[in-house]
Amino acid sequence: MRFLAVIGALAILVGIGATLFFFGGFYSVAGTAEDPAIVTWALTRVRTASINRNASDQPPASINISDAATVQAGAKAFAARGCANCHGAPGVNWAKFSEGLHPDPPDLKDVVGELSPAQLFWVVKNGINMTGMPSFAQAGVKDDEIWSIVAFLKKLPVSEADYKAWTVQPAPSH
């Protein structure tokens, strides 16, 4: 019985300590502060589990994400929507402001191989809370355009020349 009382008292003390730590302003939420490893681990686990649980959409029959025209449309959308500002692109440097994002935005060519098209679609459509990754759906981007971005992402890495050719806007006709 005494053992349970000690465990209970310790649990209460830990709870009070955690409450003071988090609600007393001792935990820094500054974008320049590194999270403790346990926080990074927990947030990464939660993010991965949420994406895995919720990502189930498949492209409609009208969209072939392996089609060259869809990939090119996705590259244009990626460029036009400002994705390269945070994630970079072949031959395109990240915007200076992206250095202030925490966690750092991933270099997509390094991570897209780990994610299925459904997972990429879910992330682009819904965004990732507390990372700076916006929800394209809330910005009014239609599913077809999001699927074209997914097609481009699944094609990464691509050459700088291909990216430039796919994203160059034609000169206005006179």
Question: Where in the sequence are the language-model features?
Answer:
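Short glycine- and Lys/Arg-enriched binding-loop motifs that mark or flank ligand-binding interfaces
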Residues: 70, 91, 123
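Extracytoplasmic/periplasmic copper-protein system
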Residues: 160-174
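Extracytoplasmic electron-transfer domains, predominantly the class I c-type cytochrome c fold
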Residues: 100-156
